[in-house]
A protein has these predicted regions:
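Surface-exposed ligand-recognition segments of extracellular binding domains, strongest
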Residues: 1-16, 119-168
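Terminal peptide-recognition signature
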Residues: 6, 21, 42, 88, ...
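Acidic glycine-/aspartate-rich tracts in secreted/extracellular proteins
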Residues: 11, 25-26, 45-49, 101-103, ...
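Disulfide-stabilized extracellular beta-strand modules
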Residues: 15-26, 38-40, 69, 138-140, ...
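Short, structured beta-strand segments at or near domain termini in extracellular proteins/domains
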Residues: 33-50, 183-194
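Extracellular disulfide-stabilized recognition modules
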Residues: 43-93
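Conserved hydrophobic ligand-interaction patch in extracellular adhesion modules
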Residues: 79-132
């Protein structure tokens, strides 16, 4: 347990909007609005045993697939594309990039292990974000590493896709079938990290 004291006049819940706690430069606590992005400190008891998985992470939700020799995680809590990208980066990876039919099969099989009931929220559960998007040039689909889909090795879109339906579908996704789709970047979806 870390011993700390509240700063003078804290907590005060000023304007009834201060629901988060911060640590000031003097090592004292204060309540602040949660909407403000701030640096943070993680705490772990010394007694907590942490094991690194075969994926080189402490996150047990990453699984190594021997066919591709890559690790994958399907996030079931939805995020928009940019937040999904950040989540994968924070975990030391990136949004999954499909390099061949085998990798599409791997993601399809992983997706199948998660029925709709395992996904939280009101959003489409038949697709997930992966690491490609339209780089501002219509129909110029590129991975988050800048490769064209052809260079990456997989271009199998579902029938009628990409269609940029009601302009704005500029981000990449995968159906449960393993086929690609263009989706709205700002609408939350499940996502694959690699």
């Amino acid at each position: 347990m870390i011993k700390v004291a509240w700063a003078k006049y804290e907590p005060d819940n000023k304007d009834n909007v201060e629901s988060c706690i911060t640590l000031n430069g003097d090592g004292e606590l204060a309540d602040r609005p949660c909407e403000v992005t701030r640096p943070y400190i993680c705490y772990r008891p010394e007694s907590l045993k942490i094991e690194v998985t075969e994926c080189g992470t402490i996150d047990p939700e990453y699984h190594l697939d021997k066919r591709t020799n890559k690790c994958y995680k399907l996030h079931t809590v939805p995020r928009n594309f940019s937040r999904a990208y950040l989540a994968c980066s924070a975990e030391g990876g990136h949004l999954a990039i499909i390099n061949n039919d085998v990798e599409a099969t791997v993601l399809r099989e992983l997706f199948a292990k998660y029925p709709d009931a395992k996904f939280l929220g009101n959003y489409r559960k038949d697709l997930a974000f992966i690491g490609f998007h339209d780089w501002g040039e219509k129909w110029d689909w590129r991975t988050v590493h800048g490769q064209t889909l052809l260079e990456a090795g997989y271009t199998s879109f579902a029938a009628g896709e990409p269609n940029n339906w009601t302009p704005g579908e500029s981000c990449g996704g995968i159906f449960r079938t393993g086929l690609l789709i263009d989706v709205w970047c700002d609408k939350p979806a499940a996502f694959f990290c690699e």
